């Protein structure tokens, strides 16, 4: 069995398990997308990681995440904004990247006293400043904090099925007692990804999302 076929089977099995775990109340399976809820987290470069944890420090994996090759590390930091009200225990996700980024919610931003933009991950031109504190030192990053846009990870095959392209915006619906329609959900396409929608904890709490579930794809904006 070739590697490409194995990858496809693994992708389909994981998506099916996520769909089963999420139930199916009021949704049509053909339009169902597994949902992941993103808590605040950090992406770092190797250089910044070593400033915070020490020269030559090992970047250690704790557990795998849903998307292939991505993982939660064993390492956490404290983040501090102008209000000097720190948020501790913010986990670093791997692998290490070529830019430093802190993804937070609006609730976090109010606590920290900053006004980060709502943008796609990696868009840092207007990002807000924060100080990161680790066991070996601290680093001030003038442009690092964002609120990540609602988005869906898709393969090109998924995109064709839903009739969307990279960079399109769409609508998704969450069922349940606090059924919610989310608009301005960004489409991101990469054939190495598994199909999954991402909301942050503010959005998830507003819709009373308590566990793994799935959303219904409604259509393009």
Language-model segments: which ranges?
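Electrostatic, structured charged patches in enzyme active sites and in nucleic-acid/phosphate-binding
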Residues: 221
């Amino acid at each position: 069995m070739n590697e490409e076929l194995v990858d496809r089977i693994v992708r389909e099995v994981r998506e099916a398990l996520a769909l089963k775990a999420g139930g199916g109340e009021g949704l049509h399976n053909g339009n169902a997308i597994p949902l992941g809820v993103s808590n605040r987290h950090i992406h770092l470069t190797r250089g910044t990681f070593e400033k915070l944890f020490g020269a030559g420090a090992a970047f250690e994996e704790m557990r795998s995440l849903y998307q292939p090759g991505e993982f939660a590390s064993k390492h956490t930091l404290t983040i501090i904004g102008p209000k000097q009200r720190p948020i501790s225990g913010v986990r670093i996700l791997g692998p290490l990247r070529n830019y430093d980024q802190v993804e937070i919610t609006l609730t976090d931003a109010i606590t920290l006293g900053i006004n980060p933009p709502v943008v796609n991950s990696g868009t840092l031109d207007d990002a807000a400043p924060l100080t990161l504190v680790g066991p070996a030192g601290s680093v001030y990053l003038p442009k690092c904090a964002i609120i990540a846009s609602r988005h869906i990870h898709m393969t090109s095959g998924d995109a064709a099925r839903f009739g969307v392209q990279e960079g399109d915006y769409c609508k998704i619906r969450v069922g349940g007692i606090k059924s919610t329609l989310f608009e301005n959900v960004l489409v991101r396409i990469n054939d190495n990804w598994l199909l999954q929608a991402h909301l942050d904890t503010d959005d998830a709490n507003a819709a009373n999302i308590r566990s793994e579930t799935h959303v219904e794809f409604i259509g393009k904006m």
